[in-house]
């Protein structure tokens, strides 16, 4: 956020993305330095507020974690959580990007090209206390020395980085899991669980080596899909699964609807309350629109837009080169390794999806030309 939160009675936020260890945070406008692991601190502040709130009033708590954002630094207690057992590699860790356009090849978010010494934990964070640094060094230093001694290159280096990445990323997730458990336990202990809606989600997905990548941004499945788990006693049924197309633009309308507040007409999502009740509206969306702008930094992911249905995904990559399309069949090719846009067997599908993209652009009032300032503050290349 470029501004302080508004409309909240109390808030703790990280400046920018924040740091993992001993972070400064902004509490109701005042910057305060804390000692501890950021995921634990965010959980602590959430529980403190729950315990001191006015119990006679309804509440909304947003417990939003930094983890597992880059650079994926685990809690020190979780270093070595997997016992150094290797993680399975995705089948397309060494994607050649055959049959696809320039954009997927000319990016800057690959484990091979973009992974830094900080990402790989070859350098310790500067915010650690001396005692924390000892714990950090006890785990990483012997392994880093072994890595430096081995002089890895090529695919062997990519594989080593992938294993380090997965250890650290999943180590971050362990602390998030623990924090979620603490909040749910408190709701049970305080007798609030039966009258509280809990929504677990994320702002985006993430590549864990698929296509050789880390990070997000792309319209591809690993980045596009997010978790969405809802507990609403008396409304959602345990084990209930929804396969409808939903989006994080639906969240605000859902919260307002559940609270009995009128939804502003300018909002572009839709309330999920009927779906959560098992009553999907007959006119629920069958497709949705995606648009990514930020270019060339970070990561050189070209501006692109697209439309997604239950089976197909049409992508239009439009800058800085001349626009071109790619079509993916999500059922025939779930890993999205083949572009079907020039396959005669998919000609009608391309036509249908192009029309759907145009319809959604009109419906959402997307400008005919993307404003230059949407791309960021660097010149297009």
Write out the residue ranges for each language-model feature.
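Short glycine-biased active-site loop of nucleotidyltransferases that positions the nucleotide triphosphate
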Residues: 1-5, 217-219, 281
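Short, structured coil segments at secondary-structure junctions
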Residues: 6-7, 78
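C-terminal cap/loop subdomain of S1 sulfatases and analogous C-terminal strand-loop tails that border
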Residues: 7-10, 71, 204-210, 237, ...
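Active-site-proximal cap/lid insertion segments
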Residues: 14-36, 51-56, 62-246, 258-266, ...
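A Trp-anchored, charged/polar loop motif used as the substrate-binding/catalytic surface
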Residues: 38-52
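Alpha-helical elements of the RecA-like P-loop NTPase motor core of helicases
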Residues: 44, 325, 338
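Short amphipathic alpha-helical coiled-coil/interface segments
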Residues: 353-357
């Amino acid at each position: 956020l470029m501004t302080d939160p508004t409309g909240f009675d109390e808030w703790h936020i990280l400046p920018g993305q924040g740091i993992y260890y001993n972070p400064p945070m902004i509490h109701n406008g005042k910057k305060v330095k804390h000692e501890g692991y950021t995921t634990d601190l965010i959980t602590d502040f959430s529980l403190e507020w729950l315990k001191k709130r006015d119990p006679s009033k309804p509440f909304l708590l947003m417990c939003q974690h930094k983890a597992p954002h880059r650079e994926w630094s685990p809690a020190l207690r979780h270093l070595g959580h997997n016992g150094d057992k290797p993680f399975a590699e995705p089948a397309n860790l060494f994607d050649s990007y055959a049959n696809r356009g320039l954009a997927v090849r000319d990016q800057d978010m690959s484990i091979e090209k973009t992974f830094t010494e900080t990402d790989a934990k070859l350098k310790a964070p500067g915010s650690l206390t001396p005692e924390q640094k000892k714990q950090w060094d006890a785990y990483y230093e012997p392994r880093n020395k072994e890595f430096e001694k081995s002089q890895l290159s090529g695919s062997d280096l990519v594989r080593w980085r992938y294993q380090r990445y997965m250890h650290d990323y999943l180590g971050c997730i362990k602390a998030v899991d623990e924090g979620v458990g603490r909040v749910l336990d408190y709701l049970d202990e305080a007798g609030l669980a039966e009258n509280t809606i809990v929504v677990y989600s994320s702002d985006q997905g993430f590549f864990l080596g698929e296509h050789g990548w880390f990070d997000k941004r792309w319209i591809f499945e690993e980045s596009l899909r997010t978790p969405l788990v809802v507990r609403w006693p008396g409304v959602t049924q345990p084990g209930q699964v929804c396969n409808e197309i939903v989006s994080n633009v639906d969240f605000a309308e859902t919260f307002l609807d559940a609270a009995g507040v009128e939804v502003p007409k300018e909002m572009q999502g839709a309330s999920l309350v009927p779906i959560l009740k098992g009553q999907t509206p007959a006119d629920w969306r069958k497709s949705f629109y995606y648009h990514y702008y930020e270019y060339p930094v970070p990561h050189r992911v070209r501006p692109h837009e697209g439309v997604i249905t239950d089976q197909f995904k049409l992508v239009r990559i439009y800058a800085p080169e001349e626009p071109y399309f790619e079509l993916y069949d999500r059922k025939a090719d779930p890993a999205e390794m083949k572009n079907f846009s020039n396959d005669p067997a998919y000609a009608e599908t391309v036509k249908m999806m192009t029309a759907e993209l145009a319809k959604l652009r009109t419906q959402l009032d997307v400008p005919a030309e993307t404003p230059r300032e949407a791309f960021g503050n660097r010149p297009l290349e």
